[in-house]
A protein has these predicted regions:
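N-terminal secretory signal peptides that target proteins for export/translocation
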Residues: 1-2
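Histidine-/acidic-rich catalytic cores in large beta-rich domains
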Residues: 22-299
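Bacterial N-terminal signal peptides
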Residues: 5-17
Length: 299
């Protein structure tokens, strides 16, 4: 069944893109933002599309549609695919407390996680049938803090950040845990990089770490590295093709930095600020200086 929702276009809002004075060129990005407000924004700061519901995670699909994990209201949340015209062409409704992640898969399935008394990771078909179900070994006392941005990785396994457990685990499809790493604070993202390392944002720990296959931290950045304090609840992250990392400050107030891009040498080269009351929970950087981010987004 096709469901139509209202979509707003070109909503003006103040933003600032800041580059350090010693950088040779200005950096611009267009991006998808998910959180209390859900929208696409171009590199000039113009909102080109929006969705009238709060979301946790989302992707711009090759066909131009948006795949979104919708925050719960009085239900268990949902996953929707919505066109730029606001037509919902796919919906999978959650059956427990909430749905906290979504990922489109190459085989056409959609990955999602359900939080609740039976925390689980699912692959569902476009017909809404469950093709894969993986039980997640997580605490049950706080459903909201069970998991966040789970991802299927190249070897067919699943990386799952488990917030309150302070651990990132790699599960096989049969539920067996084949790798894990303890984290210094609640992990939000677990991004398996091409070199085999894993990039992890540690939310209220206000830090980002990169660990190798043995769990050793090989790179770390936090508020301790800057005279200003850009970290303010490090939720979503994305590793760009140039090696830089974009990080969200989910709890940032209006007028404060909501997103920032940091180099391997811990230099901030781009920031995004707006006057919205809603924070950015996660995001997808779509281009840099007008050049589309090619390949699989590392987010």
């Amino acid at each position: 069944m096709l469901i139509r929702v209202a979509v707003l276009f070109a909503i003006p809002i103040l933003f600032i893109s800041v580059v350090r004075a010693d950088d040779p060129a200005k950096i611009t990005h267009s991006f998808l933002a998910t959180g209390g407000e859900t929208y696409l924004q171009d590199s000039e700061g113009k909102v080109t599309w929006s969705f009238p519901k709060s979301t946790r995670d989302g992707w711009v699909l090759p066909n131009g549609n948006l795949l979104l994990a919708v925050s719960k209201s009085n239900d268990g949340g949902s996953v929707v695919e919505v066109t730029r015209e606001g037509k919902i062409v796919f919906e999978f409704k959650g059956t427990q407390a909430e749905i906290n992640t979504v990922q489109p898969l190459p085989n056409g399935h959609i990955l999602l996680t359900e939080a609740g008394d039976n925390p689980r990771l699912l692959e569902v078909t476009r017909e809404g049938k469950i093709a894969v179900e993986v039980s997640i070994q997580a605490q049950r006392k706080d459903h909201h803090l069970q998991t966040r941005m789970a991802r299927k990785i190249a070897n067919g396994n699943y990386l799952v950040p488990q917030l309150l457990d302070k651990v990132v685990r790699e599960y096989q499809a049969d539920g067996k845990i084949v790798w894990e790493v303890a984290t210094p604070n609640w992990p939000f993202t677990a991004i398996r990089l091409d070199n085999g390392n894993t990039l992890i944002n540690c939310t209220i720990g206000n830090m980002t770490i990169e660990v190798d296959k043995d769990g050793k931290t090989v790179w770390q950045v936090s508020n301790d590295d800057f005279p200003v304090k850009p970290f303010d609840d490090a939720c979503g992250a994305q590793r760009l093709p140039n090696g830089n990392t974009v990080i969200t400050a989910y709890h940032a107030k209006p007028g404060k930095t909501k997103l920032f891009e940091v180099t391997r040498e811990k230099q901030i080269v781009w920031t995004y600020t707006d006057q919205r009351g809603a924070g950015i929970h996660h995001f997808q950087i779509l281009d840099t200086n007008g050049k589309e981010i090619a390949g699989r987004p590392l987010r």
